[in-house]
Design a protein with these regions (language model features):
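Short, surface-exposed "cap/lid" segments of acyl-processing enzymes
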Residues: 85-122
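Core residues of folded domains in eukaryotic genome-function proteins
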Residues: 35-37, 43, 67-69, 77-79, ...
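N-terminal targeting or regulatory segments adjacent to alpha/beta-hydrolase or S9 domains
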Residues: 1-62
Length: 194
């Protein structure tokens, strides 16, 4: 007997009762594109993002000499950044690294543990303030949305340089920054940065 390729298995107590074939789903909810283990795009436009990488709060500290916190860049677009600042006292402001996570513009977050751990260590080792900016992801937000968000993050950072008083987040990160030495890096394709 041939087994059906798709189906539903009905169990009663501990005995197999029947296998009822289920026809393939050609409705608007059918998956039309998939990055296995990461994202599914359904015909009706619904996007399912699978929990590929654990997210950690900014208070999670893999590097004891670094403090981190989240700030809002653009609330209407949902843009935010995670900022890492070395704790050691210094008389001189630190250079700033604006970092964009990888993921092909489809997946990723500054809150992913892999990026959080790496950037926390980088801030401590390189003695710099790291600003890890979020950006809107495809397919919900097609390119050039991610590019525009990168430009918005850089513009936001420039605005921070000209502001006095308490900084977003209220924990003093802005006073530690040398806004005359800002660098951009990431695990994105280099074409984003050109």
């Amino acid at each position: 007997m041939r087994r059906p390729k798709t189906g539903s298995l009905l169990l009663g107590s501990s005995t197999l009762l029947a296998v009822i074939p289920t026809p393939p789903d050609h409705s608007s909810a059918a998956v039309i594109e998939e990055i296995p283990g990461l994202i599914k795009l359904h015909r009706n436009g619904h996007v399912v993002r699978l929990p590929a990488m654990p997210e950690v709060p900014s208070t999670y500290s893999p590097e004891p000499g670094v403090v981190s916190g989240d700030v809002t860049i653009n609330p209407s677009a949902g843009l935010w950044a995670r900022i890492y600042v070395p704790r050691y006292p210094g008389r001189h402001p630190l250079p700033v690294l604006l970092y964009f996570h990888g993921g092909g513009f489809c997946v990723g977050s500054p809150a992913w543990r892999c990026y959080h751990n790496f950037l926390s260590r980088l801030a401590g080792t390189a003695a710099c303030v790291v600003v890890s900016a979020s950006y809107r992801l495809a397919p919900e937000h097609r390119l050039p949305a991610a590019y525009e968000d990168g430009v918005a993050a850089l513009a936001w950072l420039r605005q921070q340089a000209g502001r006095a008083g308490a900084d977003p987040g209220g924990w003093g990160w802005r006073a530690r920054c040398d806004f005359g030495r800002v660098f951009v890096a990431g695990t994105l394709p280099r074409t984003l940065l050109l």
